[in-house]
Amino acid sequence: MTIRNQRFSLLKQPIYSTLNQHLIDYPTPSNLSYWWGFGCLAGICLVIQIVTGVFLAMHYTPHVDLAFNSVEHIMRDVEGGWLLRYMHANGASMFLIVVHLHIFRGLYHASYSSPREFVWCLGVVIFLLMIVTAFIGYVPPWGQMSFWGATVITSLASAIPVVGDTIVTWLWGGFSVDNATLNRFFSLHHLLPLILAGASLLHLAALHQYGSNNPLGVHSEMDKIASYPYFYVKDLVGRVASAIFFSIWIFFAPNVLGHPDNYIPANPMPTPPHIVPEWYFLPIHAILRSIPDKAGGVAAIAPVFISLLALPFFKEMYVRSSSFRPIHQGIFWLLLADCLLLGWIGCQPVEAPFVTIGQISSFFFFLFFAITPIPGRVGRGIPKYYTE
């Protein structure tokens, strides 16, 4: 190729050369397993959420008198509207399932350790943004569970000393959840996915600064191959399997994670007998309820994310992967079981023995992060990880 042809080649232009560098020729450890495909899958889920959300917004009316009917209009009158709604509603759960798997893979292989501290912290911020976005997106259908879920969750801010009630009034736009609340939540639900997309690009850029971790936790600049075509083809297996799972979900069981009360228009007079949050809030909900005091329960939510953010700043471990750390591996599986137990407790009534089980499970959840540095110092016989 002549110099003139190289100058006008698309791959030589700044934007295309950047894409080529980060998506095609990006050097990747050759021993990555299928667990490393969930990051890309999460990006695909985010794109699906943004695209379906834009089309749904074309037919949705953010007004308390029209919101519920506009959702039914999408389901019944808009061609393909039922598919758009089910893809968007269940796509949020699919997105969070993928991200949870992505996080637990990072915990198992200690992907938060040096030199990828910033990558992990950005990921935790993205996870927090996702939860906020999912909560805000649960309000626009304006069913009974949407209304009362918004009322209960936003009321938690009243536990903040001095300014709590002012914050709640500001969130509501009045003295109760009403039209102003619906409008501002709908507007924020448009904005936050764009912030999520930007944060995801920063997350990707930070990852590519030092390269991906690998199942062995061993740093090497030699044993690497280009992402394309090798890992594109390998990840295709996971993407096809996920697409099949998601298709079965939205075509055969689209309401399996929904709540029947949300098919009743919002009514501030009757309170549902049991207000249950979406499944991705259940572990946090269980931790919140495990402390009898309202202010203490709300205060316990912050340490969940602070604990995740603090992981990279623990003392450096001699070996990274849990495959070589049986003590940490056992603790990890106990944490996974504990999170599943917290999820189950979160949807149970506030009564014995569920409260006691929730308190024990919450204690172990925080204990895991407190003792994480200890097993990391065990195993001096295994060669230390080097970043140079």
Curated annotation (Swiss-Prot):
Cited CDD domains: cytochrome_b_C, Cytochrome_b_N
Molecular function in Gene Ontology: metal ion binding; ubiquinol-cytochrome-c reductase activity
Highest taxon above the source species: Eukaryota
Bilayer disposition of the protein: Multi-pass membrane protein
Lineage: Eukaryota, Viridiplantae, Streptophyta, Embryophyta, Tracheophyta
GO BP, sorted A to Z: mitochondrial electron transport, ubiquinol to cytochrome c
UniProt-annotated binding residues for a ubiquinone: 208
Note on cofactor: Binds 2 heme b groups non-covalently.
The protein, known as: Cytochrome b
Gene3D superfamilies: Cytochrome Bc1 Complex, Chain C (1.20.810.10)
Positions contributing to heme b b562 binding: 88, 189
Quaternary context: The main subunits of complex b-c1 are: cytochrome b, cytochrome c1 and the Rieske protein.
InterPro entries cross-referenced by the UniProt entry: Cyt_b/b6_C (IPR005798), Cyt_b/b6_C_sf (IPR036150), Cyt_b/b6_N (IPR005797), Cytb/b6-like_sf (IPR027387), Cytochrome_b (IPR030689), Cytochrome_b_C_euk/bac (IPR048260), Cytochrome_b_N_euk/bac (IPR048259), Di-haem_cyt_TM (IPR016174)
Subcellular location: Mitochondrion inner membrane
Further facts: Heme 1 (or BL or b562) is low-potential and absorbs at about 562 nm, and heme 2 (or BH or b566) is high-potential and absorbs at about 566 nm.
Needed cofactors: heme b
Keywords from the UniProt entry: Electron transport, Heme, Iron, Membrane, Metal-binding, Mitochondrion, Mitochondrion inner membrane, Respiratory chain, Transmembrane, Transmembrane helix, Transport, Ubiquinone
Annotated family: Belongs to the cytochrome b family.
GO cellular component: membrane; mitochondrial inner membrane; respiratory chain complex III
Residues reported in the UniProt entry to bind heme b b566: 102, 203
Major location category of this protein: mitochondrion
Membrane-spanning parts: 38-58, 82-104, 119-139, 185-205, 231-251, 295-315, 327-347, 354-373
Function of the molecule: Component of the ubiquinol-cytochrome c reductase complex (complex III or cytochrome b-c1 complex) that is part of the mitochondrial respiratory chain. The b-c1 complex mediates electron transfer from ubiquinol to cytochrome c. Contributes to the generation of a proton gradient across the mitochondrial membrane that is then used for ATP synthesis.
